[in-house]
């Protein structure tokens, strides 16, 4: 939320015509996901005043490791991960709650420059979760994999369902086809803000991420199987669902080696 406030203050101080990247993305223009249809999706929650609050999404990649966005985490806060959840406001009977034991942010991440990339972090859980029909590990792409333009993808999360709207209590999904780097980095889209280590998806002005989905997965259908190709990173500060401003994700396939090393040696 701090990053949201930073960008909001830029708008308040007379920069409303500029297009800053806005982190903390959420699902806009989507629909409620079928219960537990995305079993690698997690809710990252922080402790405040004795209560837990959803702040970001994430992806279960090992029984005791979660992948999320670097801008979602802080060493000054206490976090937990909830797996197997669908409705955050009620007990579904399928949830597992696990404390975050260690936060590993990519060493090149710069919290003052989200557009530089490296918006990825791994969370080591205090204990391994139990895999079942409601909790599964994500399939990750091979290192270096690049999505074809217009590849079918879905974003999922509990974020806002419209710009400046309320958080969703039930998991939402929205169809966001991928946008090729050559298009997304063109001057009529994101320009030089987008890097080759990112994935763009959507941009139709209707469906997008928005504040609250950050850190969550972009599930893409490749060779008949859904795999997580993106970590939700930022949207336009002009609004979540702005035409030709696709939701931008950290490209998972650019960080496979880094993640494998962190997991092996941490």
UniProtKB/Swiss-Prot annotation:
The active site is at 71 (charge relay system), 119 (charge relay system), 214 (charge relay system). This is Chymotrypsin-like elastase family member 1. It comes from Rattus norvegicus. Residues 27-264 form the Peptidase S1 domain. It is an enzyme of class 3 (hydrolase). It comes from the Eukaryota. Keywords: Calcium, Disulfide bond, Hydrolase, Metal-binding, Protease, Secreted, Serine protease, Signal, Zymogen. InterPro entries: Peptidase_S1_Elastase_sf, Peptidase_S1_PA, Peptidase_S1_PA_chymotrypsin, Peptidase_S1A, Trypsin_dom, TRYPSIN_HIS, TRYPSIN_SER. Binds 1 Ca(2+) ion per subunit. Serine proteases that hydrolyze many proteins in addition to elastin. GO terms for biological process: digestive system development; elastin catabolic process; exocrine pancreas development; inflammatory response; multicellular organism growth; negative regulation of transcription by RNA polymerase II; pancreas morphogenesis; positive regulation of angiogenesis. Its EC number is 3.4.21.36. Residues 1-16 form the signal peptide. It is found in: Secreted. Its cofactor is Ca(2+). One of its GO terms (molecular function) is metal ion binding. Residues 17-26 form a propeptide. Pfam families: Trypsin. It catalyses: Hydrolysis of proteins, including elastin. Preferential cleavage: Ala-|-Xaa. One of its GO terms (cellular component) is extracellular space. Belongs to the peptidase S1 family. Elastase subfamily. Ca(2+) binds at residues 85, 87, 90, 95. Disulfide bonds join 56-72, 153-220, 184-200, 210-240. Pancreas.
């Amino acid at each position: 939320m701090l990053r949201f406030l930073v960008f909001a203050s830029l708008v308040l101080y007379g920069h409303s015509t500029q297009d800053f990247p806005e982190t903390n993305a959420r699902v806009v223009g989507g629909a409620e996901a079928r219960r537990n249809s995305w079993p690698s999706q997690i809710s990252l929650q922080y402790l405040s005043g004795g209560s837990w609050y959803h702040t970001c999404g994430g992806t279960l990649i090992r029984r005791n490791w979660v992948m999320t966005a670097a801008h979602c985490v802080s060493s000054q806060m206490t976090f937990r991960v909830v797996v197997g959840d669908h409705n955050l406001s009620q007990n579904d009977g399928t949830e597992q709650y696990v404390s975050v034991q260690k936060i590993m942010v990519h060493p090149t991440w710069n919290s003052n420059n989200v557009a530089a990339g490296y918006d990825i972090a791994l969370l080591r859980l205090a204990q391994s979760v139990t895999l079942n029909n409601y909790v599964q590990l994500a399939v990750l792409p091979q290192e270096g994999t690049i999505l074809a333009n217009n590849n079918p993808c879905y974003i999922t999360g509990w974020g806002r369902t419209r710009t400046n709207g309320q958080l969703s209590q039930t998991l939402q999904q929205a169809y966001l086809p991928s946008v090729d780097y050559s298009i997304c980095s063109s001057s009529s889209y994101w320009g030089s803000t987008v890097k080759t280590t990112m994935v763009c998806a959507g941009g139709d002005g209707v469906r997008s991420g928005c504040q609250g989905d950050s850190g969550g997965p972009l599930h893409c259908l490749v060779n008949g199987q859904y795999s997580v190709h993106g970590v939700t990173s930022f949207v336009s500060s002009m609004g979540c669902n702005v035409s030709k401003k696709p939701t931008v994700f950290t490209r998972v396939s650019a960080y496979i080696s880094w993640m494998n090393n962190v997991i092996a040696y941490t």
